[in-house]
Swiss-Prot record:
Source organism (scientific name): Escherichia coli O127:H6 (strain E2348/69 / EPEC)
Keyword Transferase in annotation: yes
The gene coding this protein: cmoA
Function, as annotated: Catalyzes the conversion of S-adenosyl-L-methionine (SAM) to carboxy-S-adenosyl-L-methionine (Cx-SAM).
Name of the protein in its database record: Carboxy-S-adenosyl-L-methionine synthase
CDD domains in alphabetical order: AdoMet_MTases
Keywords: S-adenosyl-L-methionine, Transferase
Length: 247
C-alpha cells in the first residue's frame, strides 16, 4: 500500500543530497503523482508504444525502473511470444518493492528485475528501451555514452522512450513553467516548506537538459527520428526511433 508523502513536512536541519532510500521508496507512488504532472499519462502511453514496437523474440529494457510502473505498463501490452523485460535500478529499496509489484501481477512475459547500475548493463536484441525520468540523475558527461549503448543495442525499427524534467533556453519560458510546476505541487497539497526542502536536496543530483540538448545527443548516437510526444509544464517525454534500415 502506498503511503502519503510527508517526508519534508517538518524542517530538516541538515538536508544533504537526494537519495532513493527506504523512506522515499515507501511514499514514491504518492510523491511522483503529486510532483510530476502527466506521470500517469506517460506510464499508460508507454504501454501503448510497447504494443506498437515490441517484436516477438526481443527484449525490452526499463532503465531506472523504480517501482516498476513502466515495466508493468509494457508487460500488459505485449502480445507476442518469447519476449522478456529487463528492469534495472540501483536502489535496493526500490528494487525490493519492484519485485513485489511485478510478482503481484501475473502475465506470460517474464521480467528480470536487477539491482545494478544502468551504465554497466549490456543492451542486446532490444525492440524498446525506456528511460523514464532516469537520465537526469546521471552525470551530464556520462549521458552520451549511455545513449550510444542504447542505440547499438536496439534492433532496427526499435524505439527509445526518454522522459525527463526539462530546462529551457528561453529564460522567460523556463521561469513560467517552473512556477506553474510549483503551482501544480501546491494544488496537490505540498507546502512551501516541503517544496523548498525537496528542491534543495535535488539541486545537486538532478541536472536537467533542454529538449534541444537531448535531441542533439540522440542524433549524435545515431537516431534519425526523435520528437517530443508529451509535455506538461517542464516535464515531458520524447519518442526516438532507430531507422528500420540501420546497420
Amino acid at each position: 500500500m502506498s503511503h502519503r508523502d510527508t517526508l519534508f513536512s517538518a524542517p530538516i536541519a541538515r538536508l544533504g543530497d537526494w537519495t532513493f532510500d527506504e523512506r522515499v521508496a515507501e511514499v514514491f507512488p504518492d510523491m511522483i503523482q503529486r510532483s510530476v504532472p502527466g506521470y500517469s499519462n506517460i506510464i499508460s502511453m508507454i504501454g501503448m508504444l510497447a504494443e506498437r514496437f515490441v517484436q516477438p523474440g526481443t527484449q525490452v529494457y526499463d532503465l531506472g525502473c523504480s517501482l516498476g510502473a513502466a515495466t508493468l505498463s509494457v508487460r500488459r501490452n505485449i502480445h507476442h511470444d518469447n519476449c522478456k523485460i529487463i528492469a534495472i535500478d540501483n536502489s535496493p529499496a526500490m528494487i525490493e518493492r519492484c519485485r513485489r509489484h511485478i510478482d503481484a501481477y501475473k502475465a506470460p512475459t517474464p521480467v528480470d528485475v536487477i539491482e545494478g547500475d544502468i551504465r554497466d548493463i549490456a543492451i542486446e536484441n532490444a525492440s524498446m528501451v525506456v528511460l523514464n525520468f532516469t537520465l537526469q540523475f546521471l552525470e551530464p558527461s556520462e549521458r552520451q555514452a549511455l545513449l550510444d549503448k542504447i542505440y547499438q543495442g536496439l534492433n532496427p525499427g526499435g524505439a527509445l522512450v526518454l522522459s525527463e524534467k526539462f530546462s529551457f533556453e528561453d529564460a522567460k519560458v523556463g521561469e513560467l513553467l517552473f512556477n506553474m510546476h510549483h503551482d501544480f505541487k501546491r494544488a496537490n497539497g505540498y507546502s512551501e516548506l516541503e517544496i523548498s526542502q525537496k528542491r534543495s536536496m535535488l539541486e545537486n543530483v538532478m541536472l536537467t537538459d533542454s529538449v534541444e540538448t537531448h535531441k542533439a545527443r540522440l542524433h549524435k548516437a545515431g537516431f534519425e527520428h526523435s520528437e517530443l510526444w508529451f509535455q506538461c509544464f517542464n516535464f515531458g517525454s520524447l519518442v526516438t526511433l532507430k531507422a528500420e534500415d540501420a546497420a
